Amino acid sequence: MATILVVDDEMGIRELLSEILSDEGHVVEVAENAQEARDYRLRQAPDLVLLDIWMPDTDGVTLLKEWAAQALLTMPVIMMSGHATIDTAVEATKIGALNFSGSF
């Protein structure tokens, strides 16, 4: 059983992923924006992060860069977006994202 942090500003996405992952036996924590994700990461490191790209306060790529610069990128991160670009996927992967899930 893994602890998974779901970071997405859309409540429906957070709820859906939380339900699916919980049903599979995982512990799911949610953050509705980058600041909540920062706060959570400072308290503990999840086993996996599902990170949205487009959020109102700070985008997911910027948050990924912050974690990498602060040596806090110690867990796998899968980037998510319904409005992805190839360039964004490549950038996130170069920073340290494990994978990128989205429609191009």
Model features per residue range: what roles?
Residues 10, 53-54, 79:
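The short loop immediately C-terminal to the conserved phospho-acceptor aspartate in CheY-like receiver
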Residues 11-29, 42-43:
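Two-component/phosphorelay signaling modules centered on CheY-like receiver
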Residues 14, 56, 70, 81, ...:
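The feature encodes the CheY-like receiver
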Residues 32-36, 59-62:
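Acidic catalytic/metal-coordinating carboxylates
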Residues 39, 61-73, 91:
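Short amphipathic alpha-helix used as the core "switch/output" element in two-component signaling
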Residues 44-50, 55:
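Active-site beta3 strand of CheY-like receiver
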Residues 45-47, 71-76:
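His-Asp phosphorelay/catalytic-motif detector in bacterial-type signaling
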Residues 62, 84-99:
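Alpha4 helix (beta4-alpha4-beta5 surface) of REC/receiver domains from two-component response regulators
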